Amino acid sequence: MRLIPLSTAEQVGKWAARHIVNRINAFKPTTDRPFVLGLPTGGTPLTAYKALVEMHKAGEVSFKHVVTFNMDEYVGLPKEHPESYHSFMHRNFFDHVDIPAENINLLNGNAPDIDAECRQYEEKIRSYGKIHLFMGGVGNDGHIAFNEPASSLASRTRIKTLTHDTRVANSRFFDGDVNQVPKYALTVGVGTLLDAEEVMILVLGHQKAQALQAAVEGNVNHMWTISCLQLHPKAVVVCDEPSTMELKVKTLKYFNELEAENIKGL
């Protein structure tokens, strides 16, 4: 596992965006051979999306031959709702870059047959071979996507019941009213994430410090689903300074020395 220790949330977003752009450009995608990118929602990736849009406008990257799969979507929330992940992605990213509409894949939380929707999502991912890079965030309790604590590390795309803590955390997007936050969501599984060629997780803020410590220094444990990254051959965790407060000094020193050349100029 790589740990990229940075100072601020803005630096995390810029580093992540630069990494994505470098991966896309090195891949040299075409119509017949697209780059497949997994994407998250929430507050954490906003700085990365902003940086990606700026780099696109500067002519540094094109998304014409990029196919995206989003991590999750609320169940029962109309896609036109301002807090649906469909709306979030268009508002913060898709509407500002040159990605074709047919290349965008989002789970349908209003599908008449939820199980079929989840199966078809997995099948569509497999039809592209694999996701080349999956970017994600992490919850205070260590969840990735909506794989809440005790999720199977072999799980696939499915419906999940959201914990009360997750709904409280997300209520900030619903005028602070937890009762407006859906109780269920569709989410890619831990196994889906582990199938990706590379997984990059962004970690911001002191409230994520325990999750980061569990990911880097703890054991693989389904109560901290972020710890699944230890099983992945190409996992990258990009974090800000407040999120590292639970790490041992020698752990942080080790990764700072290891990644010194990769964090210059931010």
Swiss-Prot record:
One GO BP annotation of this record: glucosamine catabolic process
Gene3D superfamilies from the UniProt entry: 3.40.50.1360
EC numbers for this chain: 3.5.99.6
GO cellular component: cytoplasm
Site (Part of the allosteric site): 151, 158, 160-161, 254
PROSITE patterns assigned to the protein according to its UniProt record, in alphabetical order: GLC_GALNAC_ISOMERASE
InterPro entries: Glc/Gal-6P_isomerase, Glucosamine6P_isomerase, Glucosamine6P_isomerase_CS, NagB/RpiA_transferase-like
Catalytic reactions of this protein: alpha-D-glucosamine 6-phosphate + H2O = beta-D-fructose 6-phosphate + NH4(+)
Active site per database record: 72 (proton acceptor), 141 (for ring-opening step), 143 (proton acceptor), 148 (for ring-opening step)
Annotated signal sequence range: none
Regulation: Allosterically activated by N-acetylglucosamine 6-phosphate (GlcNAc6P).
Keywords tagged on the record: Allosteric enzyme, Carbohydrate metabolism, Hydrolase
This protein's pathway: Amino-sugar metabolism; N-acetylneuraminate degradation; D-fructose 6-phosphate from N-acetylneuraminate: step 5/5
GO MF annotation terms: glucosamine-6-phosphate deaminase activity; identical protein binding
Chain segments annotated as transmembrane: none
HAMAP family per record: GlcN6P_deamin
Subunit structure of this chain's protein: Homohexamer.
Known role: Catalyzes the reversible isomerization-deamination of glucosamine 6-phosphate (GlcN6P) to form fructose 6-phosphate (Fru6P) and ammonium ion.
Family: Belongs to the glucosamine/galactosamine-6-phosphate isomerase family. NagB subfamily.
Protein name as it appears in the record: Glucosamine-6-phosphate deaminase
Organism: Salmonella typhi
